[in-house]
Amino acid sequence: MEKKNSVGIIETKYFTFAQAPNQLVLESGEKLGPITLAYETYGALNTERSNAVLLLHALSGDAHVAGIHKGEQGSGWWDSMVGPGKAFDTEKYFVICSNILGGCQGSTGPSSTNPKTSKPYALDFPLVSIGDMVECQRHLIDYLGIKKLLAVVGGSMGGMQALAWLVRYPARIKSAIPIATAVRHSPQQIAFDEVGRQAIMADPAWHEGNYYTGPGPAKGLAVARMIGHITYMSDTSMAEKFGRQKRNKVRPFKFTADFEVEGYLQYRGDNFVKRFDANSYLYITKAMDNFDASDGKPLHEVLKGTEAKVLVVAFKSDWLYPAYQSKEIAKACKLAGLQATYCEINSTYGHDAFLLEAKGETHLIKHFLKKVFYEYEVTGTYEI
């Protein structure tokens, strides 16, 4: 059953480029091709092609941001934000979302077939960067015939991509909305990612990445997800959701999941294994750790001359991407002379707030996009 203001049934599309001999040259210097991106679109592109918004997903996300797939249960990962009358109003904007390079939800990644061997790439897949992901998105935007995006928007790793767009292609965007993200990872953020990677690689079923004919490192990937999920929540949200409540049905074993929070983490880990590739987890987290929006330089110096408007959003209880990192982004934008706004939402959900605080985000984003789009709405003209 479709929800109120839903975009309805959505079909995933595929775009393939970088065919030999024109493979994509990655930041590492290696070449990769052909490359396929899975993507979805919502709403309609206007005559001037001026109303396109690119949504950028986080680590475990995909192209399916809103609506439902035929014959499947559950809506897209940001369904509360995309649709008629919502933050990204599909009666006004043309919304695009693609699965990243290195992913496992339809886009080329480690689990894809290597044309040279006719087997999955596994660890023969080259290391990719956030910049490489954005470069692939730029090819998709060109394919769709869009010269300038109204906005690039994303939370967490999606926010990193938004910053990469702002730095790499400032002339191709009117605005950017980085949410709950950072210019670069802190040592603590890198440490959490490394523990997750080690959990996967310590699983005997990982087989140095060559597990595609077998069961795969399910235990290791589940543990990695459990670690990650702890960082997505806050102490307050865990206390409110679980407290120290014991489970009703406990298996007769000394170290079973006695507490509700233990059972919940195991459930999240086991479900994640069903839809995500372990090697993709390794590659994507490494790309996040290596990301530096300003390449070691002061961000405000890199952004000088940029005309895009920026809305930076953070959440008070987010300890994975604490608010000070978002404040650094906003400060750099203002020092560079950009029109930048910083907003901190008082939420108890932790890092997950960027997916859950739809009401607060909708209020901010609706007004911001209306302001950015004001020239076109009032005059009917748009500079590209």
Predicted features and spans:
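Catalytic active-site module of serine/aspartate enzymes centered on a nucleophile-bearing elbow/loop
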Residues: 334-384
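Short alpha-helix in the alpha/beta-hydrolase fold that links the catalytic acid
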Residues: 296-299, 322-332
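Catalytic-loop region of hydrolases
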Residues: 1-55, 69, 382-384
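Conserved hydrolase catalytic core segment
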Residues: 148-188
